[in-house]
A protein has these predicted regions:
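Short catalytic/signature loops enriched in Gly
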Residues: 4-6, 79, 124, 306-309, ...
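The feature captures the beta-strand-to-loop junction immediately N-terminal to the Walker
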Residues: 43-45
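Conserved small/polar residues in nucleotide/adenosyl-binding loops
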Residues: 48, 505-512
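A short, proline-enriched helix->beta-strand linker immediately N-terminal to the Walker B motif
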Residues: 407-411
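Catalytic Walker B motif of ABC-type/P-loop ATPase nucleotide-binding domains
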Residues: 413-416
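P-loop NTP-binding/switch modules centered on Walker-like glycine-rich loops
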Residues: 418, 422, 426-503
Length: 512
């Protein structure tokens, strides 16, 4: 893979879900590079995290799911290249931002003293509340009871109100008892905090020493932050001001103003704490608090030009996902009938996707749709263009789903068990179609499956997923002929060994 470009780089990815008052981890520290024009299979049992993993970089996590940590860097030159018009509003905004950054930069001179003041404030706050050990102990006791209460409440929801009244009454009483204990523990915690606070307020010697030290720090800080900044810092801030505008240039006016304000606050806080903004990683981190950073490259009198690192783990705006999902990363799901709208014609479903992501007329979209239908093997495409999904067989519906996925020529095609709901005789045809079209469209296949037989036919490399972790990663030949992990051995051993059974039967028959 050394000669191929990394298309998607996943580093230490963790995906979690909020479920019934708990946080559950579905993906645990996955690191993986996916290359251009390759076929990679993600295999594992049901519940291993295969679909969640791919949904994380397709922006399709359920509402209770979130990326807790990690990066998903998507390398796409077209999306990375950013051009923003340099109109009067842009010039005025950049000038205003530059002026503010120059003012904030004075705070960098006093960053060491600022951190000392914050540390002193933190020390006083800790003195006025529980120690870390006391807090952890109190929180652990409360959390244990809350978990018990949640489990009982969920259990109560499963009981039959007409047949299990006694159990419901007993469970309700236990829930009420736990509620009382939780309130008592919370009250005890609050009283301890009040006692600590009162003791700290009555400590006259400490308070006098604190006030004197804080006054000393404030005087020193005022002197340091009164200095003028250097020309080098001004030049840095000019570039930063342009990068801030480049980074929010794609938003509508109201959101643009809101995001600029958020970035101003983020940079002020960073300068107060002495963050080295000449360090690319640290600068990116400041931008990530609001949006991903667009790095300044050059400009003309009419426009600013920049480039960005697209970190899919940090994208929050639905409009940003609209530029990626479908257009750059497409998905073929397991059941074609649930992927298609039953009351809209096949042709309309394909053309609507084309028109959404491409600047084409309905006539041009129809021509593209017919061409795609022919390429995926739909006979008499012109006659079947206005048919509804129920008029197609399962295999034909899946071919249409593939056509929709490929309509915008994506860089990555995620195939989430696309043959599971199909007849065995159709599965091989769909797999062959996906591989054949890859040669023409040059997309990367990410194939999710629990069927190792499918892996052998379609994949170049295989990642074995277990409990949200990649426990083995190898090319197809190595995985089948030299598996290293016991779980991989078990998966391979679960395959039917028809040849061996036949041989044993023949041997027994010969002995007879």
């Amino acid at each position: 893979m050394e000669d191929k470009k990394v298309l998607l780089s996943i580093k230490d990815l963790q995906v979690k879900f909020r479920v019934r008052g708990r946080i559950l981890t579905a993906i645990r520290g996955v690191t993986l590079d996916i290359y251009e024009n390759e076929s990679i299979a993600i295999v594992g049992e049901s519940g291993a995290g295969k679909s969640v993993f791919t949904k994380a970089f397709a922006g399709m996590l359920d509402s209770n799911g979130f990326i807790d940590q990690g990066d998903i860097i998507f390398n796409d030159a077209e999306l990375s290249d950013t051009v923003v018009p340099l109109n009067s509003y842009a010039k005025k905004t950049i000038a205003s931002t530059w002026e503010k950054l120059n003012e904030y930069s004075k705070l960098e001179y006093g960053s060491e003293v600022f951190l000392k003041m914050k540390a002193l404030e933190q020390e006083k706050e800790e003195k006025m509340t529980l120690s870390e050990e006391e807090r952890e102990k109190a929180d652990a006791e409360i959390k244990e009871l809350v978990i018990k209460r949640t489990e009982l409440f969920n259990y109560k929801q499963t009981l039959d109100t007409s047949k299990e009244k006694a159990k419901i009454k007993e469970t309700s009483a236990e829930i009420s008892r736990l509620d009382g204990e939780i309130k008592a523990l919370q009250k005890a915690k609050e009283e301890k905090i009040k006692a600590h606070k009162q003791a700290a307020m009555n400590d006259t010697a400490y308070n006098q020493a604190y006030d004197a030290k804080m006054a000393e720090y404030k005087k020193e800080y005022a002197g340091l932050t009164a200095k003028e900044i250097t020309d080098e810092t001004r030049k840095r801030n000019e570039i930063l001001a342009k990068e801030i505008y480049l980074s929010v240039g794609r938003y509508k006016l109201r959101k643009k103003v809101r995001m600029i304000k958020k970035l101003h606050e983020a940079f002020k806080a960073a300068m107060e704490r002495g963050v080295d903004l000449n360090d690319e990683q640290k600068r990116n981190g400041v931008f990530d608090q609001a949006t991903f950073r667009v790095r300044y490259l050059d400009e003309t009198p009419e426009q600013l030009h920049g480039t960005c690192i697209i970190n899919l783990a940090k994208i929050q705006d639905p409009n940003d996902w609209g530029q990626i999902r479908g257009k750059k990363i497409a998905t073929v799901f397991q059941d074609p009938m649930t992927s298609l709208n039953p009351i809209i014609t096949i042709g309309k479903q394909i053309t609507s996707v084309i028109m959404k992501h491409q600047d084409v007329s309905e006539v041009e979209a129809r021509a593209q749709a017919l061409e795609l239908m022919e390429k995926v093997g739909i006979p008499n495409a012109e006659q079947r263009f206005d048919d509804y999904p129920f008029q197609y067989s399962g295999g034909m519906r899946q071919r249409i789903v593939i056509a929709i996925a490929l309509s915008c020529r994506p860089k990555i095609l995620i195939c989430d068990e696309p043959t599971t709901a199909l007849d065995v005789t159709i599965q091989a045809q769909i797999l062959k179609l996906i591989k054949d079209l890859q040669k023409e469209y040059n997309y990367t296949i990410v194939f999710i499956t629990h069927d190792l037989g499918v892996v052998a036919n379609i994949a170049d490399r295989v990642a074995v997923l277990y409990a949200g972790q990649i426990i083995e990663f190898a090319n197809v030949e190595e995985l089948f002929y030299d598996p290293r992990h016991p779980y991989t051995w078990a998966l391979l051993s679960s395959l039917p060994q028809l040849a061996e059974r036949c041989l044993l039967y023949t041997s027994d028959a010969a002995d007879d």
